[in-house]
């Protein structure tokens, strides 16, 4: 794996000279191998080690290189055709493979090759970009978007219209991460490598980026880029120092309790894959 990493790093440094017609066959093979590993979940762009998230930048570089290496090709769709560099994940799936991987994909859901979808995951008409990792038991609801290289944990609910930011454009250092057992409310946007820690509930219409103040009303603390575990977050405002105006902020109103869990708990009837 280390040798592969070094070859990807070297190719990335020379990316300005790479085109689909001039790329070295070995570089093409290496990048395709990484995309295949990401697709199977054998590697992931970020993983939690000893309680801390670590980003494997070389895997992200391989994803970026794929856009330099692979040419556009016609992709067949149910009602139309597409023309893109990245094939669709499920293009060659049959009934047996869907059953073996225990996933449900509702018509018009789009998943690009190079993203991993865990068992017992339900994809409503949504979009999952390449390099993303969607773990087991997660629901990606209607019109939700999982951006490039984003990391979605187990038993997460991404409600309708949710946007989870990617890393490719604009180029971000680290992926957006939603940890296990989180609920992201409708039309909320979590971007720019923000980490929503385990068991948190984000209300409808909350927008969080790296510069967003995340204010804990119980403690007075202000967080940036991280929603502490078990937080219930709503959209709000904080006053300016001069008192003449207020600016948007995400407000931690409380910690998750039994009442909250009752409202956002997973409906097992909707997660039946068999």
From Swiss-Prot:
Broad class of enzyme this protein falls into: transferase
Annotated binding of substrate, by residue: 104, 141
Reactions catalysed, as given in the entry: (S)-2,3,4,5-tetrahydrodipicolinate + succinyl-CoA + H2O = (S)-2-succinylamino-6-oxoheptanedioate + CoA
UniProt-listed InterPro entries: DapD_Trfase_Hexpep_rpt_fam (IPR005664), Hexapep (IPR001451), Hexapep_transf_CS (IPR018357), THP_succinylTrfase_dom1 (IPR023180), THP_succinylTrfase_N_sf (IPR037133), Trimer_LpxA-like_sf (IPR011004)
Single GO term (MF): 2,3,4,5-tetrahydropyridine-2,6-dicarboxylate N-succinyltransferase activity
GO biological process: diaminopimelate biosynthetic process; lysine biosynthetic process via diaminopimelate
Biological pathway: Amino-acid biosynthesis; L-lysine biosynthesis via DAP pathway; LL-2,6-diaminopimelate from (S)-tetrahydrodipicolinate (succinylase route): step 1/3
Membrane-spanning parts: none
CDD domains linked to this entry: LbH_THP_succinylT (cd03350)
The EC number(s) this enzyme carries: 2.3.1.117
GO CC annotations on file: cytoplasm
Localization per record: Cytoplasm
Keywords assigned: Acyltransferase, Amino-acid biosynthesis, Cytoplasm, Diaminopimelate biosynthesis, Lysine biosynthesis, Repeat, Transferase
Assembly: Homotrimer.
Similarity comment: Belongs to the transferase hexapeptide repeat family.
Protein name according to UniProt: 2,3,4,5-tetrahydropyridine-2,6-dicarboxylate N-succinyltransferase
Organism: Shewanella sp. (strain W3-18-1)
């Amino acid at each position: 794996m280390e040798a592969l990493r070094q070859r990807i790093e070297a190719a990335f440094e020379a990316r300005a000279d790479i085109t689909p017609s001039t790329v070295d066959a070995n570089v093409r093979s290496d990048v395709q191998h990484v995309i295949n590993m990401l697709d199977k979940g054998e590697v992931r762009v970020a993983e939690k080690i000893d309680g801390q998230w670590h980003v494997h930048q070389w895997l992200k570089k391989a994803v970026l290189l794929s856009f330099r290496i692979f040419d556009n090709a016609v992709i067949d769709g149910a009602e139309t055709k597409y023309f893109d560099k990245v094939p669709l994940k499920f293009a060659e799936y049959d009934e047996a493979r869907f059953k073996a991987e225990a996933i449900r994909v509702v018509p018009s859901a789009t998943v690009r090759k190079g993203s991993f979808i865990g068992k017992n995951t339900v994809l409503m008409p949504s979009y999952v970009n390449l390099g993303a990792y969607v773990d087991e038991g997660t629901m990606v609801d209607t019109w939700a978007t999982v951006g490039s290289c984003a990391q979605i944990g187990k038993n997460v609910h991404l409600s309708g219209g949710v946007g989870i930011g990617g890393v490719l454009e604009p180029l971000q250092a680290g992926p957006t991460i939603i940890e296990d057992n989180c609920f992201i409310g409708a039309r909320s946007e979590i971007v720019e490598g923000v980490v929503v820690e385990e068991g948190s509930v984000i209300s409808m219409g909350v927008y969080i980026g790296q510069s967003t103040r995340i204010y804990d009303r119980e403690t007075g603390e202000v967080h940036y880029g991280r929603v502490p575990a078990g937080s219930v977050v709503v959209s709000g405002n904080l006053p300016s120092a001069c008192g003449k105006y207020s600016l948007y902020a995400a407000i931690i109103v409380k910690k998750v309790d039994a009442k909250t869990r009752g409202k956002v708990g997973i409906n097992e009837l909707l997660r039946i894959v068999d």
